[in-house]
Design a protein with these regions (language model features):
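Short, aromatic/basic-rich helix-turn unit that serves as a nucleic-acid recognition element
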Residues: 2-5, 33-61, 87-91
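N-terminal DNA-binding recognition helix of tyrosine site-specific recombinases/integrases
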Residues: 70-119, 158-160
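C-terminal catalytic core of tyrosine-transesterase DNA break-rejoin enzymes
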Residues: 94, 144-146, 150, 154, ...
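Short, charged phosphate-coordinating catalytic segments
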Residues: 109-114, 150-180, 267
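Long, amphipathic, Lys/Arg-enriched alpha-helical "connector/arm" segment
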Residues: 121-145, 154-157, 208
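Catalytic-site neighborhood detector that most strongly recognizes the C-terminal catalytic loop/helix
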Residues: 130, 210, 273-299
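Active-site/catalytic core of tyrosine-dependent DNA strand-transfer enzymes
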Residues: 130, 204-244, 255
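C-terminal secondary-structure termini that scaffold catalytic or DNA-interacting sites
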Residues: 184-202, 207-209, 215, 298-311
């Protein structure tokens, strides 16, 4: 029997469909692995970050497909291990672990007594040969990805955070508040709050980046390129100019390396990058900065400005 659902948004319709699909099963043994994952995603939507939900939906659609129609009552560790082994041939260890994590969390909602005994691929320790900050700056200069790249490498912003900045998020004295992210899910742009409580943070924009940003209407976005366009243009530009492969997210790693080289204390490194935890940092959602934080910002700005001295 086919049943369609109509709701105010696609997200609400998907929740109703998942809820109906689970309720119509008379016995727990009729619930499949796919049903359980759909139910888990619907249950967590609005609680977990939009990027996490998008990742879950991608896993549901493309990974561990041989398990999706298996009733939970018939699921065995042998089946799970076989599916994981097959995925390990084409996916990275991290991707396999993410898929397994979604599987275990979903099954636990409906069969809390099921014990997984899966052997997962060993974690990979990759040492990437990335371009230097100077090479990156020279490569993107004058391109449509210069501003996104500088925001990511200089201020340690994620792609979704770069795309979520609006002019009203920047005060007259140049303080940027990271409030929202923009993520494309199922072909639709969704504006959501930042990934975690500590992703919501404030940064002092250096004059160079303020000049790149310019002026605009309060509700206008500073960066209007799609995530896929930014990613493709950046990767292709870096490869063409430096001969090295680098993802946009690698810019955050470059930023972390810069802070490490400059001896920036972990407290301020995590604060700038949105990695902080309650045990290391108080709430930073305010318009004042400690003297130590200001000194840290100036130290990083001075280092980055050094790459532009030939202009």
């Amino acid at each position: 029997m086919y049943k369609s659902f109509t709701a105010g948004t696609k997200k609400e319709a998907e929740f109703l469909a998942a809820e109906y699909n689970l309720k119509r099963k008379e016995k727990p043994k009729d619930v499949t692995v796919g049903d359980a994952i759909d139910g888990y995603i619907a249950n967590k939507d609005g609680v977990l970050s939009p990027s996490t939900i998008a990742g879950y939906r991608n896993i549901r659609k493309n990974q561990l497909q041989e398990l999706m129609d298996v009733p939970l009552s018939k699921l065995t560790n042998v089946m799970v291990q076989a599916a994981i082994n097959r995925e390990a041939h084409t996916l990275s260890a991290k991707s396999v672990r993410n898929a397994h994590g979604l599987l275990t969390a979903s099954v636990a909602m409906y069969m809390p007594d099921f014990v997984f005994r899966t052997t997962l691929p060993a974690k990979e320790h990759k040492v990437k040969d990335l371009p230097s900050p100077k090479q990156i700056i020279d490569a993107v200069k004058g391109t449509d990805v210069e501003l996104p790249a500088m925001l990511a490498m200089w201020l340690s912003l994620r792609m979704s955070e770069v795309r979520g900045i609006r002019y009203k998020d920047i005060t007259e004295n140049g303080i940027l508040t990271i409030r929202n992210v923009r993520i494309a899910m199922a072909g639709q742009i969704e504006k959501e709050k930042t990934k975690t409580f500590h992703s919501t943070r404030q940064l002092v924009l250096p004059e160079r980046i303020l000049n790149m940003i310019g002026e605009g209407e309060p509700d206008d976005y500073v960066v209007n390129l799609s995530a896929s366009t930014i990613y493709k243009h950046f990767v292709n530009t870096i490869l063409e100019k430096t001969g090295k492969h680098m993802t946009f997210h690698d810019l955050r790693h470059v930023n972390a390396s810069i802070m490490l080289a400059l001896g920036v204390p972990d407290k301020y490194a995590m604060e700038r990058g949105g990695w902080s935890t309650p045990s290391t940092l108080k709430n930073v959602y305010q318009h004042t900065f400690s003297e130590e934080r200001i000194a840290t910002d100036q130290k990083i700005d001075g280092y980055m400005e050094g790459f532009f001295k030939d202009e």
